[in-house]
Amino acid sequence: MLVNTIRQKVSEVISKVYDSEIEFEIEIPPKKEFGDLSTNAAMKLAKTLKKNPREIAQEIVKSLDEDPSFDRIEIMGPGFINFFLSNELLRGVVKTVLERKDEYGRENTGNGVKIQFEYGSANPTGPFTVGHGRQIIIGDVLSEVFKELGYDVTREMYINDAGKQIKLLAQSLWARYNQLLGVEKEIPEGGYRGEYLVDIARDLVSEIGDKYKDLWNEEVEELFKQTALNRILSSMKDTLEKIGSSFDVYFSEKSLIEDGTVEEVLKLLKDRDVVYEKDGAVWLKVSAFIDEEDKVLVRSDGTYTYFMTDIAYHYKKYKRGFRKVYDIWGSDHHGHIPRMKAAMKALDIPDDFFNVILHQFVTLKRDDEIVRMSTRAGEFVTLDELLDEVGRDAVRYFFAMVDPNTHMVFDIDLAKAKSMDNPVYYVQYAHARIYNLFSNAEKKGVKFEEGKHLELLGNEEERVLMRNLGMFNTVLKEVAQMFAPNRLTNYLQSLAESFHAFYTKHVIVDPENPELSNARLNLALATGIVLRKGLKLIGVSAPERM
């Protein structure tokens, strides 16, 4: 809100005086003596016009000098313009928040453009790991923020239910089934050793007895494959419910083969002369588009590679009418991006259609010791176990608060702490404090009138809090532009910090001064609205009591 206001005013001056349009930054300066907000507009324009940036800054300041939105405007250094906002402008933020309530921060930047976020996608060969958990929360927050900015968002999970890993899963379950019946069977090389398969095998023994003891054929393979898939997918959906996540679409890889999409795409690629046969396999001419080796699409035994089905999947996304798709992948899949871009180009799909957001790995820390994890070895902490230990709110907030590009160390002890050192507790406590103020006001006989006496707000702590409230929609845009949910958690920490400072330094509910109390309660209410909205976008509760 505040950034939009200043951007519009500065842009109008630049257009009127210099007949130019430029992109420039507006941000909170590092020190309070530099004002409430600062811009580099003069320096950006100076590069374009080949003029002295301070002279341009002086012209901008001169044009805005009488504007009631500013107490004063100063030029610093080579041409930074520092704005000291008027109380009138800041009070307008509180008024707007109170008027719009949960709609505050919502914009129509996206104009209903149809986009898709695909995330959480995993081989259904075992429970979700904590790494999957991080990806799910990144996807959830980005989906919510893009919806808030006016995009038509579809959340989708891709189920890798075709391919060699599913056969390995069936063989692993069959081995566990036989072991329970007293038959010595080894888990196949590269198979799955987790205890979850023992539980499924135990249920199978109860249901069918020893019917398939030491018996393996296509029928048995299909039975064990479907049993494992159904049980694990059901368990994964239970975990999603526990973490508070849901998807609009669960898309089966197998369906792409069954409905002919893979063959359709393969024919398209052949018609475009971007595939060839070698050693009995079908290859994509990746090297015709990027500096990388060609890749196999169909193996010599006639089975499709994961690359082939993935190309078909994204072709189908395009045909479903998405303007852009965003896949969220672990950083170990970065090598798959260029070849997928090449495949999209081969299908004549626009360059900006397919986008990938990478995230780094997660390490768990408990009692200052690192907990190590591995899916196939069966020795890993599941997302369910983490949720059971620290709770949904902490899991969601902690996964959101680290830049996706940064390796994350999840401190279990900190996540469980009921103290102000715990970031999620710190923000939630600010929200609970606000609601306690209204209970306190009622007990003390202070009548609350929404939107009244805002003209009494204006001390330093109130100004900082009002300014921070006015940055909310700017932060949402930053989250979307940078694909960085941590921008939102950083903002909520800052907003909570400014509220705690306001709460600690000033008497908010004072029966001897009802009008000032009312003004401060309005500021507190506006803060509560934004805290609650921000937490909701992350999928975290906003308790009224703690």
Swiss-Prot record:
A motif ('HIGH' region) lies at residues 122-132. One of its GO terms (biological process) is arginyl-tRNA aminoacylation. PROSITE patterns: AA_TRNA_LIGASE_I. The keyword Hydrolase does not apply. GO terms for molecular function: arginine-tRNA ligase activity; ATP binding. InterPro entries: aa-tRNA-synth_I_CS, Arg-tRNA-ligase, Arg-tRNA-synth_N, Arg-tRNA-synth_N_sf, ArgRS_core, DALR_anticod-bd, Rossmann-like_a/b/a_fold, tRNAsynth_Ia_anticodon-bd. It catalyses: tRNA(Arg) + L-arginine + ATP = L-arginyl-tRNA(Arg) + AMP + diphosphate. GO terms for cellular component: cytoplasm. Keywords: Aminoacyl-tRNA synthetase, ATP-binding, Cytoplasm, Ligase, Nucleotide-binding, Protein biosynthesis. Disulfide bonds: none annotated. It is found in: Cytoplasm. PANTHER family: ARGININE--TRNA LIGASE, CYTOPLASMIC (PTHR11956:SF5), ARGINYL-TRNA SYNTHETASE (PTHR11956). Belongs to the class-I aminoacyl-tRNA synthetase family. Monomer. HAMAP family: Arg_tRNA_synth. This is Arginine--tRNA ligase.
